[in-house]
Amino acid sequence: MVPYAGRVRSGVVRFNSLDYQLPLTLPPHAAHGTVFAQSWTVVDISASSIELLANLGSQWPFGGSVSHRIELRNDHVRLELSVTAGDHAMPAQVGWHPWFRKPSHASLIFESMLQRDGHGITTAIREQTDAVNVDDCFINPLAPLSITVNGVELVLSSDCSHWVVYDLSPHSTCVEPQSGAPNEINDSPVILAPGESLTKWFDIAWTGRLIH
């Protein structure tokens, strides 16, 4: 998810006192960035890794590009996203939206969840709740995050500050690391100077333990 992650209220990005309208991909809001439907160019490939590059597309008013490196290691997959401003400064955010088959067990323990308002947008109000039957943003994992799928334990880690958990589907669960909360591109954005980058990583590891 680049150059924003999660929902953007009403699809409007406000930057330097100007409003920019984004496509309403999750009406009445924009969501999940502009590059999930973009064509990517392979810039490097090996037996165990690939690096992809895409521009942020015409739907993003500030230009810029993103690279995604995916590397298979002995016991985990390492993903690294790097979004780079072009000729103009811009707000930026990155994240991933992996879908997993419904886990038979999950250990997703966080310090707190950020409440949503009546429009489904994250607020700064915190509460303590389990990450079960939710579509919400969480902060500060209190233990390694893990899910068990088809008897294999997966451990999820990232240098992202926020995690969105979507657990409402009967067949799947999403555990999504993001560099900020939904709509943070307006509320408290990271601003990139021309040519500057924001880079984050996400690991999906398997322990080798088969859990029945």
Model regions: which residues?
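Acidic, contiguous internal or C-terminal segments within carbohydrate-active enzymes
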Residues: A54-F100
